[in-house]
Design a protein with these regions (language model features):
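Bulky hydrophobic segments
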Residues: 2-92, 98-99, 118-239
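Active-site-adjacent scaffolding segments
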Residues: 89, 93, 103-111
Length: 239
């Protein structure tokens, strides 16, 4: 019975990962093959950092759609096939840049793409789905404000708010799934609440400190949106 429940949960998780991949990959393709919007240029975000992040996310989603409850094992072909697929897509992606106004192929972008894929697969080699998802999400919400040289909240207030709320809510949910409670212990209580917010608050503090150290804008509105995301994540995990 327990195995059946676990199998059904894994199948449901795979469906969600396939749906996420079906939405993410086409969106990534479209955004990479249109002229760079003026607001993106104004934000002055590190291009190589963005390549690293989006390919790390793509690789995580690809693997999770194939084996949502297993780690990458390099003795089997799965990890190598995912890496080959990402490499092939990255080559096609860079090749098509010649046909887009204002864009050009760059070998350094390819290196950043492969670095993102390699890091994601490395994480998936060590960790299973929930902690791996938490790490990839943490990388995303940590790196974006550090990479942006302009205040994203001023340039794109709605999108930036959605990003922080959604990103920190997702991380909080994944974080709570990684917490282990003694058998029979109550899921909801002060100890559970403290453990649930400890990781997200540590991530928020690290992002704030790193952004300030790098001279990047990460102010009270950014932190408020992130705190809202943490609250949403805790409330969803609680129910």
């Amino acid at each position: 019975m327990a195995f059946k429940v676990q199998y059904m949960a894994m199948a449901q998780r795979r469906k969600w990962m396939i749906l996420a991949l079906a939405l993410y990959w086409p969106a990534l393709f479209v955004l990479a093959h249109i002229p760079i919007p003026a607001v993106v240029r104004e934000a002055n975000i590190s291009d190589k950092g963005i390549h690293f992040l989006v390919y790390a996310i793509l690789t995580f989603l690809l693997w999770s759609a194939v084996g949502p409850d297993s780690k990458v094992t390099w003795r089997r072909p799965g990890g190598w096939l995912i890496l080959a697929a990402v490499l092939l897509y990255s080559l096609c992606d860079e090749g098509l840049q010649h046909f887009v106004s204002g864009r050009s192929a760059d070998a350094r972008d390819l290196v950043a793409d492969l670095a993102g894929a390699a890091v994601a697969l490395g994480v998936l080699t060590v960790f299973s789905f929930w902690p791996a998802g938490a790490i990839v999400t943490a990388m995303t919400v940590y790196m974006l404000p550090v990479l942006a040289r302009r205040n994203l909240m001023n340039l794109l207030p709605v999108m930036t708010t959605v990003f922080y709320v959604g990103g920190y809510a997702t991380f909080t949910l994944l974080w709570t799934r990684c917490l282990r409670s003694p058998k029979g212990a109550r899921r909801v209580g002060w100890a559970w609440l403290a453990a649930s917010v400890a990781g997200p608050l540590a991530l928020l503090a690290a992002t704030r400190i790193s952004a300030k150290a790098a001279g990047r804008p990460f102010d009270r509105w950014d932190m408020l949106a992130a705190a809202m995301g943490i609250l949403v994540g805790v409330l969803v995990a609680w129910t």
